[in-house]
């Protein structure tokens, strides 16, 4: 086995105007009218507690890809979101090849819209865990709302600059941000 160095590693890559402003607005409207909204949060799945723990995460979410049915999400969306999924996955492959160089064989079906209302949040976390999410290597986030329409909602990484400030991703409607799934972050 030959190890490959990554001389140009960045902890995130952001592409502006990945989706047009009009398309962002259409997506939000279309998804909220056609898909089943779920209460987002850290899942509690033991015999005593089944549901959502809002101490760590409080959001609304819509799943946009077919997945195995669980009692916490639908198995099939009402519309076909494959074109959006393919656009994101194609860009993920390109970004990975040029910047991250992870050994990625395929993408999982975790395409979803997450809405953060005024008091919503997601504390420090990574996007990998045991089970199927342990295979994840790259996370993508698309900013669908103009940042002038809300306060807060910063995507921050658990990395600090020279002044000990958390690194924040610029908020720009239509942009997509890729980062390693193991990188701790919060909203």
Model-predicted regions and their roles:
Residues 2-101:
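Non-heme Fe(II)/2-oxoglutarate
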Residues 75-187:
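Catalytic core of non-heme Fe(II) oxygenases with the double-stranded beta-helix
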